Design a protein with these regions (language model features):
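Membrane-interfacial, low-structure loops and terminal tails that flank and connect transmembrane helices
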Residues: 132-148, 215, 280
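Short, charged juxtamembrane terminal tails flanking transmembrane helices
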Residues: 1-3, 135-139, 340-347
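Alpha-helical transmembrane segments and immediately adjacent membrane-interfacial amphipathic helices
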Residues: 6-29, 40-63, 75-97, 103-131, ...
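Short, Lys/Arg-rich N-terminal segment immediately upstream of the first membrane anchor
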Residues: 1-8, 143-151, 217-218, 283-285
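Short juxtamembrane and helix-loop transition motifs at transmembrane-helix boundaries
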Residues: 2, 66-72, 211-220
Length: 347
């Protein structure tokens, strides 16, 4: 990877973060109706995920081009976790406020904080990314002493698993204890967020275990299957909600779930790439980055249709804006998988 390309792949997450922050703030400031007070903060805090993805990108790229320092090893994960905490605090503040739509908005923003924490954990697991090509070329399948210890690898996987478990419990509580349509909306979105967090377990586990050299051939299908299943669950529930509540104002949440499914499938590109190149040559590895490009386009095309629909049905206002933000997330994931492909290439 040359210096110019390394700058480009680090600029993409920052550009997408700037888009989310600016667009979210614009939506929020342009009115006081519930739709804007919901879509604005959600799109804004999607920027936190982009920042955490930037930290992952910078961590890997600096190792590839030889500019990784001891300070960077701690700085980038710390930035990711800081944005995660700030997002969670903001979500809690919104829940406690009394503005229109605060219940849904606050819970969703908290969920975005959970995703940001998972991505920050992926950045942490990437601090020894440079060992993956070496371990992949080792035919003895032995553990690399320079990689993570068993305890460190297990801790990273535990952290992201615990965050995913929190998201699932949060989702269940919203469904079970909720009495308002808003609880159905918030619970459904949290379901999709839990699917994304669970998908990130596969990414963190793949990176951490390959960096340690303990990744097995059996895990290739295991982690890939987990991510694809999570995306499918979110997609199917999204379709069910769209048609089950067709004449109700809350069926818009189905489109949000479809967007979260597309994010899961974007994450799958990284998990698939790591699986395909482990102790194997995969000539089509440089084609895998097409996956998040396609999911980003799908988000944007769906958002375009919903923008038109919003002129006739107000319930389409929120998903149209949120899907635009999801498109930014998917495009950011394109830069990450491209970096992974470059860093693991045997050329």
């Amino acid at each position: 990877m040359n210096h110019g390309i390394s700058i480009l792949f680090r600029a993409i997450p920052l550009a997408m973060a700037a888009f989310c922050f600016a667009y979210g703030a614009y939506i929020f400031a342009a009115g006081t109706d519930a739709a804007r007070l919901t879509a604005g903060p959600v799109v804004f805090y999607l920027g936190s995920i982009c920042i955490a993805l930037y930290c992952t990108a910078a961590t890997i790229i600096r190792q590839i081009i030889g500019t990784y320092t001891a300070a960077a090893k701690y700085l980038f994960p710390a930035i990711g976790y800081t944005f995660a905490v700030l997002t969670l605090i903001s979500g809690a503040f919104i829940i406690a406020s009394h503005w229109p739509g605060a219940l849904v908005t606050g819970h969703v923003v908290c969920g975005l904080g959970l995703i940001t924490a998972c991505v920050a954990t992926a950045a942490t697991s990437s601090t020894r990314f440079s060992l993956i090509p070496k371990n992949s070329a080792d035919d003895s399948f032995s553990v690399n002493p320079a990689g993570f210890t068993r305890a460190e690898s297990s801790l990273l996987i535990f952290i992201v698993s615990a965050i995913a478990a929190i998201a699932w419990v949060w989702c269940i509580l919203l469904y079970v204890r909720g009495t308002l349509p808003a609880h159905i909306v918030a619970g459904s979105v949290m379901f999709g967020i839990a699917c994304v967090c669970t998908s990130l377990i596969a990414l963190v586990a793949s990176i951490a275990r390959q960096a340690r050299g303990s990744y097995t051939m059996a895990e290739k299908g295991k982690w890939t299957g987990l991510v694809l299943t999570m995306g499918s669950l979110a997609f199917v529930l999204g379709l069910i909600l769209i048609f089950a509540y067709w004449d109700h104002p809350i069926n818009f949440v189905g489109f949000v779930l479809i967007g979260l499914a597309l994010i899961c499938w974007s994450i799958s590109s990284k998990v698939i790439l790591l699986a395909k190149i482990w102790h194997a040559d995969f000539p089509l590895a440089n084609r895998i980055p097409i996956i998040p490009v396609l999911t980003a386009l799908a988000c944007l095309f769906l958002a375009a249709f919903l923008y038109e629909e919003a002129a006739f049905q107000a319930k389409s206002f929120v998903p149209a804006r949120v899907l635009s933000g999801f498109g930014a997330i998917c495009f950011t994931l394109y830069s990450i998988v491209s970096i992974l492909e470059s860093g693991t290439s045997k050329k």
